[in-house]
Design a protein with these regions (language model features):
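Electrostatic, structured charged patches in enzyme active sites and in nucleic-acid/phosphate-binding
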Residues: 1-116
């Protein structure tokens, strides 16, 4: 099955990954964790960027989330990674990602690390 970015999903004993590239990165991070270079490796971590908006007690806008591919601790710092393949600045999907990346920095003080 392909997703919106035409990547092939990868099903493994460790779970389902959005692409082969993402699964390879997961394997690399697992090796780094076993070697003690990183710790607390997590996948698909959800961050709320904007809460739901209410007007007269009714929800008029749902919350906005960013889902990080990987989150881990390295040298006492939280690292958030997003695995990126081809980047098309003209695409709507990439534009949404850039906005969410900027909101992560603004709201949480975390700069998303893009890996390819």
């Amino acid at each position: 099955m392909t997703n919106k970015y035409r990547n092939q999903k990868v099903v493994t004993p460790h779970g389902t990954f959005d692409s082969k590239r993402e699964y390879r990165r997961y394997q690399e991070l697992m090796l780094l964790q076993r070697a003690g270079k990183i710790s607390e490796l997590r996948r698909q971590v959800k961050y709320e960027l904007l809460p739901s908006q209410r007007l007269n007690g009714k929800c008029v806008e749902r919350p906005l989330y960013y889902i990080a591919d990987f989150v881990y601790t390295q040298d006492g710092e939280t690292v958030v990674e997003d695995v990126k393949g081809y980047r098309d600045p003209a695409s709507a999907g990439y534009a949404k990602y850039v906005i969410k990346r900027k909101l992560m920095l603004y709201r949480y003080g975390i700069r998303v690390r893009e890996v390819g």
